[in-house]
Amino acid sequence: MPRDRKAEVEAAQKDLDFTKNTYQVEFDTTLGKIVLELYPDVAPGHCKNILGLTKIGFYDGIVFHRVIAGFMAQVGCPEGTGTGGPGYTIKQEFNNRLHEAGTLSMARTSDPNSAGSQLFLCLARTPHLDRQYTVFGKTADDQSLQVLLKIGTGQTDRNDRPLKEVKINSAKVLVTPK
């Protein structure tokens, strides 16, 4: 029987309280740590989703399967191919936050409400994505941005897959009381 990730994620989200705490996600990658601050004020559903997935260990061991220099680095497919997800989708929360270097946004198909677990981190300003994809966070500090930019400099094959595997070794939620 397949895992019911939606139920696992919902259970992991039960103790989240954006009024009492500030949450960040830390990806410990093969090239260093990326800490992401979240925007629950404009995309609470997306923030809850990444926090729940992180808490159940979904991102642990997942590879960056698509990297386009000067554009973005994509991660979050459990198969490592760009075709998989958590087994459910979430509704879009388009907002006025801009896609710029360090921005955290959700990948999706042509259906605006098809995002699940795949996310991308922008390597540069990408205005054509504004209000077309949900921005829900950004790199929390310059060190995290530098690790992300380093991921963006690796060689890739013709399908934009890194020739040298870059993966999230582990991911965790960081909680700071307000």
Identify the meaning behind each predicted range.
Residues 1-178:
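Cyclophilin-like peptidyl-prolyl cis-trans isomerases
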